[in-house]
């Protein structure tokens, strides 16, 4: 058994901080017939760190994000129901002309395309001042929901538009799902999920939920809004991919040694919808099984050659992306998925697992279950949690260590460690057996 320890400080939180000050105007013309009056909100909106995905291949764990669709939705609860069994915040549509057309306020300053903001700004968080003056009605507690996406300029979006009905949709029930087109495409190939995060008003010191009560005397309030990921991140950074592997598919009559033409990472179960507030899959969410989340094309057209002596796939280093010689990285985002949605592996062991690596030449198959390094719980079958990063290999500004698949390849079964990185800066040990 060989043990490697790679220490690295990771920061994958995608956080938005809104410093909010609120003052009610004394101008009577700022009052509507229902008693709503204009309330000025001055915000400092910031996004820090993150990971990139999809066609925007991940280059590093360090902060790099592409937020170009930042929205703020308003929800409210009658003051008399606050703290009772009937407490519920329902969607409140804005009345201002531009916001009313869309149903939300837009922070236009977030307009990233390429390059990724923090990667090109000394890894510093993106922040913008933002001011709105919504009409808010007396006698209600107001909660502001921020939703950030990165698909503003994408032709075929993979996420649906939130459908909120005024005075009906509850904050706890607000959800976003993959589009039907995205789900149908995923069944034929790779499932891609865009970057998505959200958050609501919190007390700046305690970080507890802190809705705002609006009355005639409302003059000023100060809050923060910290948004974290609604999706999970996946990074697979590997090197020295074996050029010959042995088949181990369930039902195989005999073992066949073959040269793979592709290597994929697969989730045995993945949901297609998420509750925005709870950051988890709703009970009635549809799920996909045995879904490919990323594939490495091992053919010459992708720059690979076979080294018959070392019996590995070779590829020139990518200095632009910072990939070592003979290495490659794939990444994606995933909807949070409960453990109960996971299926059995397609290898001969047929044990339940969350992720596996799939080698194939189109005819033969090898499935290597992926396990996470943990001291408790099931190492193979575990939930996919929002705002967590599931990674194999290490890459940041200070560490560049892809996972060596040849060194840890075992013909019978490879137990690949996968580290779960919480969405806070923290030092971890990556241990491979």
Residue positions per predicted region:
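Extracytoplasmic cysteine-anchoring/structural motifs
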Residues: 22-433
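Sec-dependent bacterial lipoprotein signal peptides
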Residues: 1-21
